[in-house]
Amino acid sequence: MNPYIEPCKLPFEPDDLYRRRVSHFAHLDVHGGDIVMLGDSLINCCEWHELLCNAHIKNRGINGDTVEGVRYRASAIMNGFPDKVFVMVGINDVSHNIAPDVIAHAIVSLIDYLHSLSPATRLYVHSLLPFDSSYHYASLHGKEQTVVAINTILQENALSHNFTYVELYRHFADPSTGLLALAYTTDGLHLTGSGYALWASLLQPYLTE
């Protein structure tokens, strides 16, 4: 068995928001031909189907979600055999002081697990975005290079684990500081409308391939 399919046992304690969101998703179907946006608040806080003008896009984001949280609810999504799944998760794991290689390999493990549930689904993994911890996020202070290291490992594993790595980081980073550019955020972590517009433009080639 592929060792990456085995869970990495990262911390996972579902809160009330997670449970409510999962219970909501239980009433929403995923079908063949659908495109699923899967992940944390960065996924959840966007009306993807409207922004990308595609009614087949389904939002399966949960604020505060982690790699193991996504893994826990993945079967309900993959059992619908969607056409494509775009994953954005990991920044909340970074805030839990977990080593970058552990987080990155947990994401790779998640992707292998998704493949095992629906082999024909095309999988895409976004790079983690830069952030600016000087706003409200003390738990992310000093962890800028953790994100860089995670992205490097993900990119290195894309071919061998049959997923497409979607580079976002360099498009969102301020070239002078390396932090999330002020044009795309008001809190140093989450995105404004301009940020999501940029993200959508970067996704277009993958939606049509």
Give the location of each predicted region.
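Oxyanion-hole/transition-state-stabilizing segment in secreted/luminal serine hydrolases
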Residues: 38, 44-52, 56, 67-105, ...
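Acidic/histidine-rich helix-loop elements
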Residues: 9-12, 54-67, 95, 188
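Conserved beta-strand scaffold positions in the cores of enzyme catalytic domains, especially
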Residues: 37, 57-59, 165
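Short amphipathic alpha-helices and their capping/turn segments at secondary-structure boundaries
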Residues: 23-36, 71-79, 108-116
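N-terminal secretory targeting modules
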Residues: 1-36, 44, 48-49, 53, ...
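Charged helix-capping and loop-helix junction motifs
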Residues: 100-110, 143-151
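Catalytic His-Asp segment of secreted/periplasmic serine-dependent ester chemistry enzymes
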Residues: 130-209
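A short helix->loop->beta-strand "cap" motif at the edges of active sites that frequently abuts
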Residues: 118-122
